[in-house]
Amino acid sequence: MVEKLPKNYPVAIAKAILGVGFLVFGANGFLHFLPVPPPVSASAQSFLGLLDSTGYMKVVKALEMLGGGLILGGRLAPLGLLILGPILVNIALYDLLMDLKGLPVVLVFGALALFIGYRHKEHFAPFFKVHAEHCTFKGK
């Protein structure tokens, strides 16, 4: 007889794929163990060259590893999503505007992040709640 899978099994798979993906791609920014194809356009090449020469990409890659690790850890997955969200948006914009070949990966990662975020919606609900009484100006 086949046992039923736990209810959160799809979330665990999504966390594993997204977390390992960002850990691997983040670590690759430091260790260069995976070949990275060069950008197709000259503007994309100079853009990435500038980001790399300033050390900006090292910070982004470290944040990718941190976010991926938090997602894999489980309990702090919402914090990992908060870290990775802006990175995913920037990767998507780069792919849309400069180099389309990475778009399928970022779409899959974005869908996984949205799925995980939806399953943790209770952690994100306060961001969307308006607390007008805390925002009033009490001047002289």
Role assignments for model-derived ranges:
Residues 1-34, 58, 73-140:
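Extended, low-polarity transmembrane helix blocks
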